[in-house]
Curated annotation (Swiss-Prot):
Organism: Nitrobacter hamburgensis (strain DSM 10229 / NCIMB 13809 / X14)
GO biological process annotation, one example: protein unfolding
Reported function: ATPase subunit of a proteasome-like degradation complex; this subunit has chaperone activity. The binding of ATP and its subsequent hydrolysis by HslU are essential for unfolding of protein substrates subsequently hydrolyzed by HslV. HslU recognizes the N-terminal part of its protein substrates and unfolds these before they are guided to HslV for hydrolysis.
Name of the encoding gene: hslU
Lineage per the UniProt record: Bacteria, Pseudomonadati, Pseudomonadota, Alphaproteobacteria, Hyphomicrobiales
Molecular function (Gene Ontology), one example: ATP binding
The family this protein is said to belong to: Belongs to the ClpX chaperone family. HslU subfamily.
Record keywords: ATP-binding, Chaperone, Cytoplasm, Nucleotide-binding, Stress response
Name of the protein described by the UniProt record: ATP-dependent protease ATPase subunit HslU
Residues passing through the membrane, by range: none
Binding positions (ATP): 18, 60-65, 246, 311, 383
Amino acid sequence: MTHFSPREIVSELDRFIVGQTDAKRAVSIALRNRWRRQQLTGSMREEVLPKNILMIGPTGVGKTEIARRLAKLANAPFIKVEATKFTEVGYVGRDVEQIVRDLVEVAIGQTRERKRKDVQARAQLAAEERVLDALVGANASAATRDSFRRKLRAGDLNDKEIEIETQSSGGAPMFEIPGMPGAQVGAISIGDIFGKMGGRTKTRRLTVVDSYEILVNEESDKLLDSDQLTQEAIAAVENNGIVFLDEIDKICVRDGRSGGDVSREGVQRDLLPLIEGTTVSTKHGAVKTDHILFIASGAFHIAKPSDLLPELQGRLPIRVELDALTRNDMRRILTEPEASLIKQYVALMQTEGVTLDITDDAIDALADIAVAVNSTVENIGARRLQTVMERVLDDISFSAPDRNGETVRIDAGYVQKHIGDLAKNADLSRFIL
């Protein structure tokens, strides 16, 4: 779990996302409150519940990007799901409890990776012995093994091919149980029923260097206590889990519609107990959702937040409105983030030996065109910049392999020549930009 202060979290998000200070502050405070709760003891820790967040803002302004970056920062079980993928319990499709089951799987993966590092030294020695067995046989003399061990550690045998027995990574066969709700629940793995009897192995032919990582992971897993690992993962989900629920506006029931809808209002009703706090059964054990943080987001360009069920609105007490992007924001998005679009295209063309020299007035022109098209056609926010950049650099991208060693200067005139007329023609830009 992260120990960053809210200020540090915001500055980390600033490296990748332009503007949206209110949203960054809200998620940074929520993340820090997870740490604060862990410092409490006794009954007070149980009483402190997370304050769930609803992010409202037009498409393409950074809602999903905040979630992506937060996942890397959080150092806690984190899952991003789209609300539109779920249906009401009892109907064909995924029910919302699958969110928690997926979150547990994420936590188990994270916990396993962390614990593997603790036993890595012992696992590497065991993996080395298995490689030596494959090279010289299990019955070779100690002198022969030592000789090959020295060569192995020096890297002299890295390209040599060996045959090793590895655990089969292919999942056990699945079969459907008719009548069980939800495709994910109805599909039962034979491996889950019969346990890990004997475990399936297969022989693979690999180079020494490629086999090493596989063997180290296998030996690490043998040294880990799977029951303890699962318990730690479930505890991490219950105390530090974060669920980012995207596209929540798409499950609103708008005015004028009557009757429930299994993929709209029904999903909202199913979300109520999950967000409020319930116990979800998973194949690893029961998981309580009382302290899982839910961050919901939606564009709400057709529906309104008030179209959500009142009970669901009450369970998302912190509202954050993200601002539409201005021309200056567009300009900053092109240049400021660590992996900005300009830097990406320059790096891509560099692989072909072509150097792009993009001037400041070209960046101004790109931002102006993106804003103009957004205002006349459909406002899709920063995503419009990708469309505009692709059109401007289309010729260069196509001919780059034949222009090795060239430097191409892109200024405002170049931008206008390649896209200016298209942007002015509203009918054409509606279909092309």
